[in-house]
Swiss-Prot record:
Cellular component terms per the entry's GO annotation: extracellular region
Signal peptide: 1-24
UniProt protein name: U3-theraphotoxin-Hhn1b
Main location: secreted
Stored InterPro entries: Huwentoxin-1 (IPR011696)
Keyword check for Secreted: yes
Molecular-function GO term, any one: ion channel inhibitor activity
Source organism per UniProt: Cyriopagopus hainanus (Chinese bird spider)
Role summary: Ion channel inhibitor.
Keywords associated with the record: Disulfide bond, Ion channel impairing toxin, Knottin, Secreted, Signal, Toxin
UniProt comment concerning the protein's domains: The presence of a 'disulfide through disulfide knot' structurally defines this protein as a knottin.
Family assignment from sequence similarity: Belongs to the neurotoxin 10 (Hwtx-1) family. 51 (Hntx-8) subfamily. Hntx-8 sub-subfamily.
Propeptide residue interval(s): 25-52
Length: 87
C-alpha cells in the first residue's frame, strides 16, 4: 500500500515537473519563475469585494442602510434576516 502511494506521488510529481519544463522551453522570456508565480497568484478584479452603500448580515445598525432582505434587530442592534416574529 505504501509503495503504491509513493509511486503515485512520484508519478504526479514527474508530470508536474514535465509540465514546468515544457512550459519553460516554450517561454522566450528570462524571468520564467516570476512570470509563472505572477500568473498563478494574479487577482482578478471580479473577485475583489466591492464597497456597497448598505450593510449586510450581522453588521451593526448605525448610519448605513440595511441591504434588501435584512432588518435591524431591535434587541441585538445588528442586521438579521426577517422572520414572521420580527415584523
Amino acid at each position: 500500500m505504501v509503495n503504491m502511494k509513493a509511486s503515485m506521488f512520484l508519478t504526479f510529481a514527474g508530470l508536474v515537473l514535465l509540465f514546468v519544463v515544457c512550459y519553460a522551453s516554450e517561454s522566450e522570456e528570462k524571468e520564467f519563475p516570476r512570470e509563472m508565480l505572477s500568473s498563478i497568484f494574479a487577482v482578478d478584479n471580479d473577485f475583489k469585494q466591492e464597497e456597497r452603500d448598505c450593510a449586510g448580515y450581522m453588521r451593526e445598525c448605525k448610519e448605513k442602510l440595511c441591504c434588501s432582505g435584512y432588518v435591524c434587530s431591535s434587541r441585538w442592534k445588528w442586521r438579521v434576516l426577517p422572520a414572521p416574529w420580527r415584523r
